[in-house]
A protein has these predicted regions:
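The feature marks helicase ATPase cores and/or their adjacent C-terminal helical subdomains
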Residues: 1-382
Length: 382
């Protein structure tokens, strides 16, 4: 049975899947965990070691692009391209476009019916475009009648796709192909509220959270929700839940208890007036989260740890101070439709990520005249 584990922020999904992997290895099984970011790969290996894992022959972790190249494309690429694809080039934009103009000669199929190398590869032919890597992998799976999937069946018993919220479009064709295997147990893990990055520039669905969740329903994946947070106190969980309150996620609960008097004197979610920010920083020494690395320089932030919203993903801190965008202020003051006209869910998801980094207190900087409908406690210097 294939499974989707949808885990809230701070749920401990990495310990969960690594513990499962160790148990499976003890039974003689071979495990591959696939994830998107390098930081996540390191975190998984570190957790494996800390939990007592030591069988690195049967426990493997790969980045998504490495997996696609090594396990699907290269072993069978000669059905489409004869020259070895050495590596990939990471695309921050569509490699077939300059601005809104499509570059001539990049269509997938040439007039003679053959595959156009320039659709998938750089001009020298030895590097693949990252944004079309899953599409190329799917073409090879189809052309070889599932040969890469059969090869995977000989190598691994269990596959985990971690951070599946970052996958889009053609990536889901790969998941679909693997899910049809009768010999591989496939588990996908993620939190769709934390979709900040995505693996490709594409218009191919699924793209949105709703579309991605529907994919797993349509493919008959077993669904498991983990809504118990092991990082943040309940008040912070409840505030972060409001960001996606209309999207069908289970309410987040918390098992975090606070007994330290030095922590208990300031817990929860707070609004801090602009003119009080430096006093707040001096008192609590929070970690600053902001939209850009250049933001917030008018405050006394030199000694603080500082992260952009995206770079803070996966991290946790005792106390967090958020320098919000105007949209975040509006949302937190009750304008729940402020994100509706945006093309992607990235901005909304970054707010969720920022709020859920905090263990005990999260403070948001407001103008000195705080709107009357602000639901947060207002912090004032003693």
């Amino acid at each position: 049975m294939n499974k989707l584990i949808s885990a809230c922020a701070g749920a401990g999904k990495t310990p969960r899947i690594v513990s499962e992997a160790i148990q499976a290895i003890d039974k003689g099984e071979r495990i591959l965990i696939i994830t998107y970011t390098i930081n996540n790969q390191k975190e998984i290996y570190e957790k494996y070691k800390s939990l007592g894992g030591n069988d690195y022959k049967n426990f493997k972790v790969k980045g998504l692009f490495t997996f696609l190249l090594e396990d699907i494309i290269r072993p069978y690429q000669n059905v489409i391209f004869k020259e070895r694809i050495e590596s990939l080039i990471f695309n921050e934009r569509d490699p077939h476009k300059i601005g809104n103009r499509t570059i001539f000669g990049r269509k997938e199929i040439l007039d003679n019916g053959e595959t156009n190398p320039l659709h998938f590869l750089t001009q020298n032919g030895n590097k693949a475009h990252s944004t079309y890597l899953s599409k190329l992998a799917k073409r090879i799976i189809t052309k070889t009648k599932n040969a890469p999937i059969k090869r995977l069946e000989y190598i691994y018993n269990k596959l985990y796709f971690d951070e599946v919220q970052d996958l889009v479009g053609w990536d889901y064709e790969i998941i679909d192909a693997i899910s049809k295997s009768k010999k591989i147990s496939l588990t996908c893990v993620g939190d769709f509220r934390q979709t900040i990055y995505q693996t490709a520039i594409t218009t191919k669905k699924p793209l949105s959270t709703i579309e991605k969740k529907q994919f797993y329903i349509d493919k008959n994946f077993e669904m498991e929700d983990i809504s118990l947070c092991r990082r943040s106190i309940l008040e912070i969980c409840e505030l972060s839940d409001t960001v996606h309150s209309n999207m069908g996620f289970s309410p987040t609960t918390s098992n975090v208890k606070v007994n330290d008097p030095n922590i208990m004197n300031h817990i929860g979610a707070f609004a801090v007036k602009d003119s009080d920010v430096n006093n707040y920083i001096t008192r609590f020494n929070p970690v600053l989260l902001r939209s850009k690395v250049t933001s917030g320089k008018k405050y006394a932030i030199e000694s603080l740890q500082k992260f952009t919203y995206g770079k803070a993903k996966g991290l946790g801190f005792d106390r967090v101070l958020i320098l919000p965008t105007k949209e975040y202020i509006s949302f937190l003051c009750g304008e729940r439709d402020v994100f509706n006209d945006q093309k992607t869910e990235s901005s909304k998801n970054k707010l969720y990520v920022a709020l859920t980094r905090a263990r005990y207190s999260v403070a948001i900087i407001y103008p000195d005249v705080i709107p009357k409908n602000c639901p947060l406690k207002i912090w004032t210097p003693e």
